[in-house]
C-alpha cells in the first residue's frame, strides 16, 4: 500500500485501559457468528488486577466484559432479549446505529427503563454497516453501570466486505480500582489500572509481511479520552464513529478517541511489528502498548492500494448550509461541580428541547466550550460533518462523538432526518448527570 496522503486533521484535534479482542482471518470477509439472541445483565467477577488482588466484582452481559460480540450483515434483522438481573433499572442502547427513536434505549427520553428482574424484547434492522457499541443509557445509573463493565461491540458488515487477511476487534476501557482490586466509586478522568482483559497488556497478534489488517477500535471508557499512537506503519483511517470515511492517514500517527468513539483502520504489514499504544503526554510516561501485531510467516504478495470502504448511500452527499437552521450551545461551569448548557444546569432530559426542527432540515450547530476542561459531546440518532472554522467546507468523515477543547468552538452540520427526541449531551455519564444533558426534537 503506498504511503497515503495526509490531510489537515484540524477537526480530529484533541481529543488503566483494558483491551478485549476478537479476531478473524480470511479472504473477502470475516467469519460471521450468529448474532447474540439473549443478553443477561448481572453481577460478575473478572481478574483485572494482578495477584495477589482478588478478582474484581463487575457488571457484565452474559458474564463477560466486554459483552459478547453481536455480528450481522446490513439488512439482517437483529432480534434479542435483555434480562435485567441488576439491582437498578437499565436499558440497552445502540448509539451510532441510527435506528428509530422508539428503539434508542434512552431511559426517560425514548422509553421507560427495564426494572430489576424485568426483561425486554428488542427488534430492529440496522440501516447502516459499521462498528459500534451497545451499552446502558439508564439515567442516574448509567455512570456506574458503564464504569463497571456493561458494554459490548456490535458489527454490521458491509454486503461485500473488503478482502483482508486479519480482522481484529478491540474494545478499550479503563478501570478505577482500590488496593484490593475493588471498583472505586469516583469520577476521576482516568483509571490507574492498565490491563488487557484478564492478561497483561498488550494483546498480541501475528501476521506475515504483506498481510492486510483491518482493526476496529472502540473506547468504552466512562470518562477517559485517549490518544492512540501508532508505530511501525502508517495506517489508513477508513471509518469513524460507525460510518465509512474517505481514507486518510492520522497526523503524526496519532489520533484521539473520546469516550464512545470508534475508529476503523486498515494497514499492510511490513517487515517489523506494528503497535497501537496509549500516549499520556500529561504524565510524561512512556507509551503503553495496547495492541501489537508481530511480523511472522512467509511474505504475502503486495495488494493494490486500499481504495476505501463503500460510501453509505443513505447519508447526504451535500448539506445545504445556506438554508440550514443555525443553533449555538454554550457549555459552561455552574455552582460547585455543576455544568450547564446555555446557562441552564439540566437534569436528565428535563425542560424544553435545545432546538426543534422539521424532518429533513439541514442544521448547523456550534458547540462552544466555556469550561476549563475538554468536553466530549454526543449527537443522538444522527451523524454530522465537522465544519471548517469559516464554514467553508467540512472534514471527509461523519461523527457522532465530538471532543470540544476548552475555550474552543466546534461546529458541525447534519440533516435532521430521524424523527423523535434525541440527546445532544455529554458522552461522559458523570458530566451528563452534572448538567450537560440537552436534547433536541425532530418532527
For each feature predicted by the language model, list its residue ranges.
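N-terminal secretory signal peptides and thylakoid transit peptides that target proteins
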Residues: 1-19
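Short tyrosine-centred short linear motifs in exposed loops/low-complexity segments
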Residues: 75-76, 118, 126-132, 210-211, ...
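Acidic-aromatic/histidine active-site loop/patch
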Residues: 166-209, 218-221, 342
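Extracytoplasmic beta-sandwich strand-turn segments characteristic of Greek-key/jelly-roll folds
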Residues: 65, 70, 96-128, 200-201, ...
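Extended terminal and domain-junction accessory segments
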Residues: 24, 29-42, 144-177, 245-374, ...
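Asparagine-centered strand-capping/turn motif at beta-strand->loop junctions
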Residues: 82-86, 218-219, 367-371
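Hydrophobic or amphipathic alpha-helical targeting/insertion segments
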Residues: 126-156
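N-terminal edge beta-strand
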Residues: 53-71, 194-204, 337-359
Amino acid at each position: 500500500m503506498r504511503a497515503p496522503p495526509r490531510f489537515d486533521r484540524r477537526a480530529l484535534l484533541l481529543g488503566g485501559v483494558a483491551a478485549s479482542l476478537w479476531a478473524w482471518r480470511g479472504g473477502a470477509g470475516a467469519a460471521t457468528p450468529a448474532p447474540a439472541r439473549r443478553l443477561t445483565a448481572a453481577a460478575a467477577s473478572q481478574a483485572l488486577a494482578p495477584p495477589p488482588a482478588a478478582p474484581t466484582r463487575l457488571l457484565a452481559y452474559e458474564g463477560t466484559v466486554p459483552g459478547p460480540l453481536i455480528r450481522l450483515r446490513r439488512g439482517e434483522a437483529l432480534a434479542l432479549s435483555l434480562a435485567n438481573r441488576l439491582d437498578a433499572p437499565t436499558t440497552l442502547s445502540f448509539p451510532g446505529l441510527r435506528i428509530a427513536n422508539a428503539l434508542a434505549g434512552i431511559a426517560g427520553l425514548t422509553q421507560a427503563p427495564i426494572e430489576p428482574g424485568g426483561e425486554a424484547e428488542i427488534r430492529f434492522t440496522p440501516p447502516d454497516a459499521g462498528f459500534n457499541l451497545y451499552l446502558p443509557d439508564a439515567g442516574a445509573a448509567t455512570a456506574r453501570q458503564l464504569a463497571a463493565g456493561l458494554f459490548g461491540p456490535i458489527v454490521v458488515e458491509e454486503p461485500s466486505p473488503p478482502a483482508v487477511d486479519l480482522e481484529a476487534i478491540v474494545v478499550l476501557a479503563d478501570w478505577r480500582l482500590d488496593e484490593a482490586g475493588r471498583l472505586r466509586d469516583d469520577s476521576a478522568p482516568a483509571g490507574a489500572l492498565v490491563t488487557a482483559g484478564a492478561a497483561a497488556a498488550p494483546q498480541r497478534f501475528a501476521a506475515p509481511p504483506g498481510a492486510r489488517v483491518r482493526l476496529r477500535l472502540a473506547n468504552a471508557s466512562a470518562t477517559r479520552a485517549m490518544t492512540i499512537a501508532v508505530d511501525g506503519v502508517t495506517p489508513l483511517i477508513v471509518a469513524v464513529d460507525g460510518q465509512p470515511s474517505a481514507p486518510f492517514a492520522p497526523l503524526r500517527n496519532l489520533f484521539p478517541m473520546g469516550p464512545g468513539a470508534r475508529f476503523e483502520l486498515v494497514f499492510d504489514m511490513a517487515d517489523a511489528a506494528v503497535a497501537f499504544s496509549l500516549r499520556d503526554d500529561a504524565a510524561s510516561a512512556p507509551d503503553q502498548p495496547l495492541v501489537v501485531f508481530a511480523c511472522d510467516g512467509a511474505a504475502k504478495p503486495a495488494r493494490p492500494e486500499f481504495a476505501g470502504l463503500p460510501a453509505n448511500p443513505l447519508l447526504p452527499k451535500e448539506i445545504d448550509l445556506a438554508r440550514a437552521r443555525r443553533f449555538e450551545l454554550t457549555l459552561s461551569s455552574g455552582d460547585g461541580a455543576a455544568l450547564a448548557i446555555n446557562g441552564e444546569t439540566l437534569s436528565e432530559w428535563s425542560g424544553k428541547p435545545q432546538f426543534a426542527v422539521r424532518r429533513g432540515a439541514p442544521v448547523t450547530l456550534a458547540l462552544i466550550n466555556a469550561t476549563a476542561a475538554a468536553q466530549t459531546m454526543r449527537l443522538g440518532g444522527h451523524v454530522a460533518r465537522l465544519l471548517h472554522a469559516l464554514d467553508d467546507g467540512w472534514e471527509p468523515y461523519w461523527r457522532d462523538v465530538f471532543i470540544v477543547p476548552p475555550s474552543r468552538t466546534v461546529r458541525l452540520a447534519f440533516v435532521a432526518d430521524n424523527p423523535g427526541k434525541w440527546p445532544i449531551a455529554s458522552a461522559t455519564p458523570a458530566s451528563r448527570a452534572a448538567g450537560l444533558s440537552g436534547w433536541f426534537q425532530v418532527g
